[in-house]
Amino acid sequence: MPDRAQVIIRIVPGGGTKTLQQIINQLEYLSRKGKLELQRSARHLDIPLPPDQIHELARSWVQETGTYDESQPDEERQQELTTHIIVSFPAGTSQAAAYAASREWAAEMFGSGAGGGSYNYLTAFHIDRDHPHLHVVVNRRELLGHGWLKISRRHPQLNYDALRINMAEISLRHGIVLDASSRAERGIFERPITYAQFRRLERQARQIRFEDADLEQSSSQGDHPEFSQSPDTAPFEASAGRSEGMPYPNNRQNGSQVHLHEPAGFSNRAGGSVRIALETQRLAIFADDIESGSPPVSDVRAGNANADSDLPRSTVARTTDYSQRWSKRPRDDDEGPSGAKRVRLEGMAVGPEANAGERDSRGDPVAPPAETSRPSSLQDMARPNTATDPLAASGHLEQRRGTLSKRPRVEDDGEPSERKRARDDRSQDGRGGNRR
């Protein structure tokens, strides 16, 4: 025997209303703006409520409370005036039987007094989903007393077990077999998820389906001729750790075969790490080109871009831009060190070179002075050379110091400067003297 469907009675959390306008909005929502029929309680002979009388009915309900002050601001109201309940049936249930059973249940629980009191209520029967269900909006103010409707586990009549059992008995009379057992009786002890959690999971599932549809649409673009090129696996092999096919930067023959453009046909998500590997490899090749002084691979590729159909124009522009960026700064190998740095290095080399020259001249006075050669690198400048002419080195140093010095120096013929001659003249005339 298949398992019987469970009775579904749900008290909507936060479904109660506190103001007159909220009652109007709730009833208009249940009637789908007047498209569906709202039905009164058995006390009003089960007659339908016309859509144009919703405002009048809502005002009568707030007046029945006896405590509703229309001059009070709505944000200060705390008393809930209505309770929203949903009675749901399994999919495929007869709509007529479901409507009759749910209406009878609402009349017995809230209109007959069997539930501890008599209350006004309205119902709306919806069949917009697979499972038919009835919305019940109950006016919480008791008709023959001064109490308020309260459904709880401790209530003698209006508790959750009593609501399910009565619904199962009434449904059976209308040919609908339902089970009213509790979760503990069915061996289910885990706490169920709340309605808010269910709605949140439902929204997440819709979002995932939407993202999957976007991925399928983007993957379908691979059939376009623009994305039909075969991927170039050389950059992947090169970035995998210098295998046999890895082009070393110092090898010009192998380096010229490196493809610096991105392989076509890869998505943005999968190509993120590929782009990082390509950029790292590209920068390493350019750095090695600059240190070695040879033309970079990008210049070779850019020069043959018109002949090579595999390299797109955008790639040539990017690589050319890299070469221009690196070529703006002159290298020390071509230009040499700056003026101040060159003087400092030459000063370091003059001392030992002059002493060495004096020793050589004392030992062999006939030996001609050696030619002064310019050092080819910074290390050669700092290294002392005994074959260098001390007079030429000292003369060159004096010439450099003379150009860099700000104060005028005494000329080679020993004549004093104009300022010194004027000071000497004043001292001879007796106008000079010690200054105090």
From Swiss-Prot:
Entry EC number(s): 3.1.-.-
Transmembrane segments: none
Keyword Nuclease on entry: yes
Pfam entry (one): Relaxase
One biological process term in Gene Ontology: symbiont-mediated induction of tumor or growth in host
Region feature Disordered, mapped onto this chain: 213-266, 290-436
Gene Ontology molecular function, alphabetical: DNA endonuclease activity
InterPro entries: Endonuclease_MobA/VirD2, VirD2
EC class of the enzyme, as a word: hydrolase
Compositionally biased tracts (Polar residues): 216-232, 316-325
Taxonomy, superkingdom: Bacteria
Sorted UniProt keywords: Crown gall tumor, Endonuclease, Hydrolase, Nuclease, Plasmid
Residue ranges, compositional bias (Basic and acidic residues): 408-429
Role: Tumor formation by A.tumefaciens involves the transfer and integration of a defined segment (T-DNA) of Ti plasmid DNA into the plant nuclear genome. The virD operon encodes a site-specific endonuclease that cleaves at a unique site within both 24 bp direct repeats flanking the T-DNA.
Record's protein name: T-DNA border endonuclease VirD2
Organism, scientific name: Rhizobium rhizogenes (Agrobacterium rhizogenes)
Lineage: Bacteria, Pseudomonadati, Pseudomonadota, Alphaproteobacteria, Hyphomicrobiales
